[in-house]
C-alpha cells in the first residue's frame, strides 16, 4: 500500500529472502496439514493495510481512544458478516486466536476449579479442551471423554453416563482431529441432562458449516467458538458466536478487558474479507470439494491393508492414518513425506501408545490443495504417492522420482 516489495527487499534483504523462500516452499509443496489453507490476495491485502496503526480498545461505539469512527465501520462489517454467515445474533470478532476465544468462554461461564468435560487429546480433542500442559487443564478440572475403542466414533451414551457421574459445569464439543460428523443436538441433550453449558469449538469445521456441509452447532450451543483460518480460509484469528444476550455481554468483557487489550483491526479487516468470501455462493462448491478430496485420499489408504484409516474414513476435511505397520511411527512418516515435498503432521490416534513427539499416526487434510484447484483425481494421485513413498522410505531413487512428480503437479496448480 505504501511500502512496496522492492523497497522492502532493499531495506531488509535477509528477511525478504526468508519470506521469498517460504513462498517458494508453499508453491512447490503439497500442503496436507488440516489446519492450514491458502488465503486470497484480498485477505492478505486487508491484513497488510495501515489499519495496524490504530489503537481501538473497546467495541464499536464504545472506544477508549478517539479517531475510531472508521475503525468502527471496519469492525462492524466483520461482526455483521459473521452473524449473517452463521445465523447468529451476537458475534465477537476480536479474539487473536481460537485459544483466546476458548479462554474467553471459560472466563465467562465457569470459575477456576470447576469441572469441565472435553474430548481427549488422543481421540481428536484440542490442547485447550483440557490438556494438562494447557492453561485449560491447569485452571479447570477437566475430565476427558473418549471415542469408542472399536468404532473410534463418539459414543454419546457413554458421554452421557460420564456426565451424570462427574456433573460438569461446562461440556466442550468439537475437535482438531476427528473425521466424522459431530451430533451437536445430542451434546445439547447431554448438557441439559446435567445442567451444564455447552460450548462448541468448531475451529476445524467452520468453513464446512458455512458452506452447508456440516450441521451447524449454533442452534444447540450456548456459545460457539472458531478460528477464522483453517477451512474458513481467512487470516489467523478467533471468533465467538452466541444467541444469548447476557452471555454475549460476559464474553465481550472477557475478551476486553479480561484477556486482551487493543484489537488487531488490520486482522479484523481481513476477517471481514474472508467472511464476505464465505458468503459467496462459490464457497459452497469449495466446501463440497474439500470433503470429496479428503474422501478420495482416505479411499486410497483404505485400499492398502498395511495402512489403517481411523474410524474407516471421513465425512469432513481430514482423516487419520495409523502408519505403524509401514514405518516406525508418525514422526518418521512426516519426515519421509517432507522429503518428497508433501507436508502434513504426525498425530496421535485414539488410545495412543506412543508419545506425542512420535505418535502412531499422521493427519491428512484437504483444505489447501482444494484452494489450489486440485480435485479428486489429483487427491487420489497424491495419496498414491504418499503410500509409495512410505512403503519405499529406504529407497532414495523412489523418493527422488516422487519428488519430481510432485513438482509437475504443483507447477500445474499455482499457489497464486
Swiss-Prot record:
Family to which this protein belongs: Belongs to the SHMT family.
Residues under site feature: Plays an important role in substrate specificity: 229
Enzyme class of the recorded protein, top EC level: transferase
Cell compartments where the protein resides: Cytoplasm
GO cellular component: cytosol
Enzymatic reactions: (6R)-5,10-methylene-5,6,7,8-tetrahydrofolate + glycine + H2O = (6S)-5,6,7,8-tetrahydrofolate + L-serine
Name this polypeptide is given: Serine hydroxymethyltransferase
Species of the source: Streptococcus thermophilus (strain ATCC BAA-250 / LMG 18311)
CDD domains recorded: SHMT (cd00378)
EC code(s) of this entry: 2.1.2.1
Involved pathway(s): One-carbon metabolism; tetrahydrofolate interconversion; Amino-acid biosynthesis; glycine biosynthesis; glycine from L-serine: step 1/1
Needed cofactors: pyridoxal 5'-phosphate
Database matches in NCBIfam families: PRK00011.1
Function: Catalyzes the reversible interconversion of serine and glycine with tetrahydrofolate (THF) serving as the one-carbon carrier. This reaction serves as the major source of one-carbon groups required for the biosynthesis of purines, thymidylate, methionine, and other important biomolecules. Also exhibits THF-independent aldolase activity toward beta-hydroxyamino acids, producing glycine and aldehydes, via a retro-aldol mechanism.
Subunit structure: Homodimer.
Keywords: Amino-acid biosynthesis, Cytoplasm, One-carbon metabolism, Pyridoxal phosphate, Transferase
Gene Ontology MF terms in the entry: glycine hydroxymethyltransferase activity; pyridoxal phosphate binding
Designated gene of the protein: glyA
Any Pfam family: SHMT
SUPFAM superfamilies xrefs: PLP-dependent transferases
GO biological process terms, semicolon-separated: glycine biosynthetic process from serine; tetrahydrofolate interconversion
Residue numbers bearing the N6-(pyridoxal phosphate)lysine modification: 230
Amino acid at each position: 500500500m505504501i511500502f512496496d516489495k522492492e523497497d522492502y527487499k532493499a531495506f531488509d534483504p535477509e528477511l525478504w529472502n526468508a519470506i521469498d523462500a517460504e513462498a517458494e516452499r508453499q508453491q512447490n509443496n503439497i500442503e496436507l496439514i488440516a489446519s492450514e489453507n491458502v488465503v486470497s490476495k484480498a485477505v492478505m491485502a486487508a491484513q497488510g493495510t495501515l489499519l495496524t496503526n490504530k489503537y481501538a480498545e473497546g467495541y464499536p461505539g464504545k472506544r477508549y481512544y478517539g479517531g475510531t469512527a472508521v475503525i468502527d465501520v471496519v469492525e462492524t462489517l466483520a461482526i455483521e458478516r459473521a452473524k449473517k454467515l452463521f445465523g447468529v445474533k451476537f458475534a465477537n470478532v476480536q479474539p487473536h486466536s481460537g485459544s483466546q476465544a476458548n479462554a474467553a468462554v471459560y472466563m465467562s461461564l465457569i470459575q477456576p476449579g470447576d469441572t469441565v468435560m472435553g474430548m481427549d487429546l488422543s481421540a481428536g480433542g484440542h490442547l485447550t479442551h483440557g490438556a494438562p500442559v494447557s492453561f485449560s487443564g491447569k485452571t479447570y478440572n477437566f475430565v476427558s471423554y473418549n471415542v469408542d475403542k472399536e468404532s473410534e466414533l463418539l459414543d454419546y451414551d457413554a458421554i452421557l453416563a460420564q456426565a451424570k457421574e462427574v456433573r460438569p459445569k461446562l461440556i466442550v464439543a468439537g475437535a482438531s482431529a476427528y473425521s466424522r460428523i459431530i451430533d451437536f443436538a445430542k451434546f445439547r441433550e447431554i448438557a441439559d441432562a446435567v445442567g451444564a453449558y455447552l460450548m462448541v469449538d468448531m475451529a476445524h469445521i467452520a468453513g464446512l458449516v458455512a458452506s452447508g456441509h456440516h450441521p451447524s452447532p449454533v442452534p444447540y450451543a450456548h456459545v460457539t467458538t472458531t478460528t477464522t483460518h483453517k477451512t474458513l480460509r481467512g487470516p489467523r484469528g478467533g471468533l465467538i458466536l452466541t444467541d444469548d444476550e447476557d452471555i454475549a455481554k460476559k464474553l465481550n468483557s472477557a475478551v476486553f478487558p479480561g484477556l486482551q487489550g487493543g484489537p488487531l483491526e488490520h486482522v479484523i479487516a481481513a476477517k471481514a474479507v474472508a467472511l464476505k468470501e464465505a458468503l459467496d455462493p462459490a464457497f459452497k462448491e469449495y466446501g463440497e470439494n474439500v470433503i470429496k478430496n479428503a474422501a478420495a485420499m482416505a479411499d486410497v489408504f483404505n485400499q492398502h491393508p498395511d495402512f489403517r484409516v481411523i474410524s474407516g474414513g471421513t465425512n469432513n476435511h481430514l482423516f487419520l492414518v495409523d502408519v505403524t505397520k509401514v514405518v516406525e511411527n508418525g514422526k518418521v512418516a512426516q519426515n519421509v513425506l517432507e522429503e518428497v515435498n508433501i507436508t502434513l503432521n504426525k498425530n496421535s490416534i485414539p488410545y495412543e501408545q506412543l508419545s506425542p513427539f512420535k505418535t502412531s499416526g499422521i493427519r491428512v487434510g484437504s483444505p489447501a490443495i482444494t484452494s489450489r484447484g486440485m480435485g479428486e483425481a489429483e487427491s487420489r494421485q497424491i495419496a498414491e504417492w504418499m503410500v509409495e513413498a512410505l512403503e519405499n522410505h529406504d529407497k532414495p531413487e523412489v523418493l527422488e522420482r516422487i519428488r519430481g512428480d510432485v513438482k509437475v503437479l504443483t507447477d500445474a496448480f499455482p499457489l497464486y
